[in-house]
Curated annotation (Swiss-Prot):
Residues 355-362 are annotated as: G1. Residues 346-514 form the tr-type G domain. One of the essential components for the initiation of protein synthesis. Protects formylmethionyl-tRNA from spontaneous hydrolysis and promotes its binding to the 30S ribosomal subunits. Also involved in the hydrolysis of GTP during the formation of the 70S ribosomal complex. Residues 402-405 are annotated as: G3. Residues 492-494 are annotated as: G5. This is Translation initiation factor IF-2.
Length: 848
């Protein structure tokens, strides 16, 4: 024996190896060597104990032997350190034990789940096997019944074939016998020999019982002679058909033959919907929906849109219910909940000061606020809506809105009347009721708000308050002094007379109104003014009407949305929130809103963006619908009318939205049937290069109202020759535009009659034609003037003179009482007794 007999060869330890055979399709196999490594579990408790045992004497030795102890450590300190060390070791042991227990629990849980999964899979396999066996048994019985019926039919046939058998008949009979024998063998199933059972093992009997009665001709692929002669082996059901039949039988056994009841759905139907989306919402096939539409005469594809009415017909045809929804439903997220009475709290009144221009509205408000706003207004007139809060002597807080009085600011006054609680109508005692006073009265009546009349400038010598009261009667405003219900107060903004009485009247009116609001809800307010600030971006002056607007709130206002970045009150101070009746400047918008838009606070940024997008699309659709409503005839008629109309294009940029609107409205009123002003674009903010490009393309001037052009815009204007005009007073702007538009008017031609001449004789002159010998009876006859030939006071000819002679000399003019000779240009039909009317044309420039 060798040295290695009975010894294991050397190798890597720590693992066990084995072989696993992987089977693939087409009989391919692959051997894989699998090595399993075992992990050595180290129990911390035992290790620690052993280690501790080895060093058990050290701490005591250290603590007992002062020479081995670290310097400066007392016995008590050493004992504490040792106790802490022992506690740490104990914790480590506990944690290790807990980890082992957790791992064991997880392993048990995994084993339990594996067993459950295996049991479930086994049950599923057994159930499927039972269903398969049942289906095969049913199929076998059906075949046997069919065979029995066929045999009975053959036996019942009348035996009329009793005639001498021919060789062909004998061959057919033998084939039939063989065929019957083959079928019997197939029905009974293939026999297995004992050797087959021994070879395949003990499970052969079970397989024979399962396969009993199965037709194996499809599997063996063999074809007997009798089958070939009989034709049975020709066209048979495919293997896929057999599988489908088995699947149907399995579903039938499981109860799948019951037809699923159709589910009726509520289909949300917008104004327009894509065909594929409609099919998806109905849970129907898209081709079925397209077929339904084609039956209606609509040739559509899956990606085409259809209107709501057509989609509703399709939904009804498929048996579902249509639920109409509108795109406007996105605005339902805006809180419109009615406030409970117990949540309402008193709020400050909102007072709008209105009246004619230069009647002292801003001066009166300055006197109340003890400020001086008039000095900062261009031209001494208000051109913006100002919002202020004033604290009265009794402690009450009042919110004032100062509106412009100029005729161009009608829309501003209308907005001021819509958001106010009380209107203070300022009328100058020395000027009485004026056009904008009447307009302010109409705005207050339309808004159904109470009115207080403040008769201003009573300190002037020409003041006549009684005339003001009388003039107001003409407009159905009856003051208390005239036995009416409207309060009237005589005040002087200059001397301060009557201001306390005015504030008392306002407080009394506010007390009667019982103004309340709920501060504990999402804010809602109105945009008083909006502008585009160079450093701060879009800024909106908002008057909070309900709720509390806080910094960080997400809001939607008109077609814009944003997040409150900062709130600035009327004193220029930053605040964190603004309650009801508080005017603030809001920063954080994504664009400049329109003055008069309503601000609503929403929950999320997505909601705000969705509402703003819907409003933008709705505005586009409205403009498109307005353009589409014009017929071709109307369009041609308008184009023909515009051919004779001269246009003055302008580009308007203003500091605030309200001023821009007022300028546009004022310019639209300029013009007549021959000339008009066309505003190409108006906006808020500084003049930019894009404005210059637009103006250059249309050969229009750029009007800047309280704004200036930036450096690139100025350079572009100089290069392209675009005129930029700056204004700070709306009077001057309107007057200049009106003068420029007047220059487009064609000059008016006026005729001045300068004389008459009577024809005394007619002479025929060769080379010249007929020449009239005339006597100037009135005025003077000039060679350059126009003439008309009158016969019996009827104009026969109008033209010019070819020649004017005095005796034989050509002269420029002939005075009254003198004789002369006249010949007409291209006209000879003159007679004795006709009268010649002499006139001159003069062009006069027209004004709008």
């Amino acid at each position: 024996m060798s040295d290695t007999d009975g010894k294991k060869p050397l190798g890597l330890g720590g693992g066990r190896s084995g072989h696993v055979k992987q089977s693939f399709s087409h009989g391919r196999t692959h051997n894989v060597v699998v090595e399993t490594k075992r992990k050595r579990v180290v129990v911390p408790g035992k290790t620690g104990a052993a280690a501790g045992g080895g060093r058990s004497g050290s701490p005591s030795a250290v603590s007992g032997d002062p020479s081995k102890r670290p310097a400066g450590i007392s016995d008590a300190e050493m004992e504490r350190r040792m106790a802490a060390l022992r506690a740490a070791k104990a914790r480590e042991v506990e944690e290790a034990a807990q980890r082992i227990a957790d791992e064991k629990a997880r392993e048990e849980e995994r084993e339990r789940r594996r067993l459950e999964l295996e049991a479930k899979e086994r049950e599923e396999r057994e159930r499927e096997e039972a269903l398969r066996l049942k289906a095969e048994e049913d199929e076998r019985r059906a075949r046997e019944a069919e065979l029995r019926e066929k045999k009975k039919a053959e036996i019942a046939k009348p035996k009329t074939e009793a005639r001498p058998a021919t060789p062909a008949d004998r061959a057919a009979a033998e084939a039939a016998a063989v065929r019957a024998e083959t079928k019997g063998v197939s029905a009974a199933g293939p026999r297995k020999t004992d050797r087959d059972r021994d070879t395949r093992g003990g499970g052969g009997d079970d397989r024979d019982s399962r396969n009993k009665g199965r037709d194996d001709s499809r599997r063996t692929g063999k074809l007997s002679l009798s089958q070939a002669l009989d034709g049975e082996g020709g066209r048979q059901r495919s293997l896929a058909a057999m599988k489908r039949k088995q699947e149907k039988a399995r579903q039938k056994a499981m109860g799948g033959n019951q037809r699923a009841e159709k589910q009726v759905r509520d289909v949300q139907l917008p104004e327009t919907i894509v065909v594929s989306e409609l099919a998806n919402r109905m849970a129907e096939r898209t081709p079925d929906v397209i077929k339904s539409l084609m039956r209606m005469g609509m040739m559509v594809t899956a990606n085409q849109s259809i209107d709501a009415d057509t989609a509703e017909l399709v939904i009804d045809e498929f048996g579902h219910h249509a639920v109409r929804v509108s795109d406007a439903d996105v605005e339902q997220v805006i809180d419109q909940v009615e406030d409970k009475p117990e949540d309402l709290q008193p709020r400050a009144p909102i007072i709008t000061i209105m009246g004619h221009v230069d009647h002292g509205k801003t001066s009166l408000l300055d006197a109340i606020r003890h400020a001086n706003v008039v000095a900062g207004e261009a031209g001494g007139i208000t051109q913006h809506i100002g919002a202020y809060q004033v604290k009265a002597s009794n402690g009450a807080v009042l919110t004032f809105l100062d509106t412009p009085g100029h005729a161009a600011f009608t829309s501003m006054r209308a907005r001021g009347a819509q958001v106010t609680d009380i209107v203070v109508l300022v009328v100058a005692a020395d000027d009485a009721v004026m056009p904008q006073t009447v307009e302010a009265i109409n705005h207050a009546k339309a808004a159904k708000v109470p009115m207080i009349v403040a008769i201003n400038k009573i300190d002037k010598p020409a003041a006549n308050p009684q005339k003001v009261r009388t003039d107001l009667l003409l407009h159905e405003v009856v003051v208390e002094a005239m036995s009416g219900e409207v309060q009237d107060v005589e005040v002087s903004a200059k001397t301060g007379q009557g201001l306390d009485t005015l504030l008392e009247a306002i407080a009394l009116q506010a007390e009667i109104l019982e103004l309340k609001a709920n501060p504990d809800r999402p804010a809602q307010g109105a945009v008083i003014e909006a502008q585009l600030d160079v450093g701060r971006g879009p800024v909106a002056t908002v008057l909070v009407q309900n709720g509390t607007l806080k910094r960080g709130d997400i809001f939607v206002v008109g077609e814009q949305w944003g997040k409150v970045r900062a709130l600035i009150n009327d004193k220029g101070e930053r605040v964190d929130e603004a309650g009801p009746s508080v005017p603030v400047e809001v920063l954080g918008l994504n664009g400049t809103p329109e003055a008069g838009d309503v601000l609503n606070v929403v929950s999320t940024e997505a909601q705000a963006r969705e509402i703003a997008d819907y409003r933008i699309q709705a505005a586009k659709d409205k403009r498109a619908a307005a353009g589409a409503a014009i017929t071709l005839d109307q369009m041609l008629a308008k184009a023909k009318a515009d051919e004779n109309v001269a246009e003055l294009p302008v580009v308007i940029k203003a500091d605030v939205q309200g001023s821009a609107e007022a300028i546009v409205q004022a310019l639209e009123k300029i013009g007549n049937d021959e000339v008009r002003v066309r505003v190409l674009h108006y906006g808020v903010g500084a003049i930019t290069e894009s404005d210059i490009g637009l103006a250059e393309a249309s050969q229009a001037p750029v009007i800047g109202f309280n704004v200036r052009a930036n450096a690139p815009a100025r350079n572009a204007a100089n290069q392209k020759g675009v005129e930029i005009r700056y204004y700070s007073i709306i009077y001057d702007l309107v007057d200049d535009i009106k003068a420029a538009a007047s220059g487009l008017l064609s000059a008016e031609v006026r005729e001045n009659f300068i004389g008459y001449a009577e024809i005394k004789e007619v002479f025929r002159v060769s080379g010249v034609g007929n020449v009239a010998g005339c006597l100037v009876t009135e005025g003077v006859a000039r060679r350059s003037a126009g003439v008309r030939l009158l016969r019996d006071n009827v104009v026969i000819h109008e033209g010019t003179l070819k020649t004017l002679k005095r005796f034989k000399d050509e002269v420029k003019e002939v005075q009254s009482g003198q004789e002369c000779g006249m010949a007409f240009e291209n006209y000879d039909d003159i007679r004795k007794g006709d009268v010649i009317e002499i006139f001159e044309r003069e062009e006069v420039q027209r004004q709008l």
